[in-house]
Design a protein with these regions (language model features):
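Exposed aromatic-hydrophobic patches
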Residues: 41-47, 91-98
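Noncatalytic modules at the cell exterior or secretory-pathway interfaces
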Residues: 50-57, 98-113
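Short, surface-exposed binding/anchoring microloops in extracellular/periplasmic proteins
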Residues: 35-65
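Short, surface-exposed beta-strand/strand-loop-strand elements in extracellular ectodomains
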Residues: 61-82, 120-124
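Solvent-exposed serine/threonine-rich low-complexity stretches and specific carbohydrate-binding patches
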Residues: 30-35, 79-87
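Bacterial N-terminal signal peptides
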Residues: 9-17
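Sec/Tat signal peptide C-region and signal peptidase I cleavage site
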Residues: 18-25
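Bacterial N-terminal signal peptides that target proteins for export
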Residues: 1-9
Length: 125
């Protein structure tokens, strides 16, 4: 009886371990608090160097997203052009860097539909 209970507990723990590692691959790189209509870009400083292979953008309110600029630890940068309207809680597709990069700064360019909008930037290893 104890053997069955131990085996069941081991199976549950192994399933939980796999589910946490799958969600640990995606993390929040940063987010903006406001995108105002008169100021068409927002800077998101990344406090620590975060390694990411690809990124995804999520709009917390309606926004027109034009481009996002990522700056890396070695001084280089990468620009992703979007030129599209994102509705509330809509996400872009995953955009890949060439290889895993250390992101230090993010600039989001766009216009808020109602004067303010939140943008969340996700990273994946």
């Amino acid at each position: 009886m104890k053997l069955k209970a131990t085996m069941a507990a081991a199976m549950i723990l192994s399933v939980m371990a796999f589910s946490t590692t799958a969600s640990a691959d995606t993390f929040t790189l940063g987010r903006t608090i406001l995108l105002e209509a008169k100021n068409n870009h927002a800077k998101i400083p990344v406090p620590l160097c975060r390694n990411a292979k690809s990124i995804q953008i999520k709009a917390e309110r309606d926004v027109f997203l034009s481009k996002v600029i990522f700056k890396f630890q070695n001084g280089s940068s990468r620009v992703f052009q979007f030129q599209r309207k994102l509705d509330k809680n809509e996400r872009t597709d995953w955009r890949r860097f060439s290889y895993e990069r250390c992101v230090t700064d993010i600039q989001v360019h766009g216009r808020a539909e109602d004067g303010s909008a939140g943008i969340r930037v996700y990273g994946r290893r």
